[in-house]
Amino acid sequence: MKAIIFLFAVLTVVAIIIPIISGEPNAGPLAASIDLKQIMEKVKPDLLKMLDDIKAKIQQG
């Protein structure tokens, strides 16, 4: 159950961050004040590893 909740939390964060990275005009004031692309390039490998870990936990049951 914890894995499912964690998965939704990660997906929510990704859903918020992806539009900001892609430079959507409605990304909000954050996109203007912070260079999130640079931050995401640093965080992306960790996020991908986290998602792989979640998949493994779900498959294990």
UniProtKB/Swiss-Prot annotation:
Which of UniProt's keywords are assigned here? Amidation, Neurotoxin, Secreted, Signal, Toxin
Q: GO cellular component terms? A: extracellular region
What does the record say about tissue specificity?
Expressed by the venom gland.
On whether DNA repair is a keyword of this UniProt record, the answer is no
Q: Name one GO molecular function term.
A: toxin activity
From the Swiss-Prot or TrEMBL record, state where the protein is found.
Answer: Secreted
- Which first-to-last residue range defines the signal peptide? 1-23
Glutamine amide: which positions carry it? 60
User: Which ranges are cleaved off as propeptide?
Assistant: 24-33
Family recorded in the similarity comment: Belongs to the formicidae venom clade 2 family.
Q: What's in the misc comment field?
A: Negative results: does not exhibit hemolytic and cytotoxic activities on HEK293 cells.
Q: What does this protein do?
A: Toxin that causes a rapid and irreversible paralysis when intrathoracically injected into insects (blowflies). Does not cause spontaneous nocifensive behaviors by intraplantar injection in mice.
Return the protein name: Myrmicitoxin(1)-Pm5a
Supply the source organism for this entry. Pogonomyrmex maricopa
